[in-house]
Amino acid sequence: MVQKGETREELILGVQKLEAAGIQTSVTFISGLAGPELWQEHAIETGTMIAEMNASYVSLLTLMLQPPCPMLDDYKAGKFKFLTPEEVLAETCLLLQYARPSKPCVFRSNHASNYVSLRGNLPMDNAAMIASLKKCMQDRGLLKDERFRML
């Protein structure tokens, strides 16, 4: 479990207050953070959080671990498993189904850690981004090779 130092509600309220004050916010989420057992819950919780926050910008990275990191220790000990590329895409699809903010939000998933680059505006472009992800799930050749993923 990742300790962020804030609760979900505190993070949402903080973003809402900044946006209400006219300060645009940019928030980043990490795909794969919950591992294979909890990826669906993580996707839904993240998507609904995006919807409730109403941030101006949202970006998505894919989990990669570098030392020193307790999660890396857990991975080496067999206590944590990474999502497969297909699971990361499925998690992102599910997240996008729930990421329906009430005002337009710029969405980017173009970090070097990601298997697929996405760009669009939530919620208007959700369906197109989901379609793009599903196409990539059917053709693994469209995914970024592991050698080119980096932090």
Residue map of PLM features:
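Conserved non-cysteine loop/helix-boundary elements of the Radical SAM core domain that shape
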Residues: 1-22, 32-53, 73-86
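Auxiliary Fe-S-binding modules of radical SAM enzymes
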Residues: 48-151
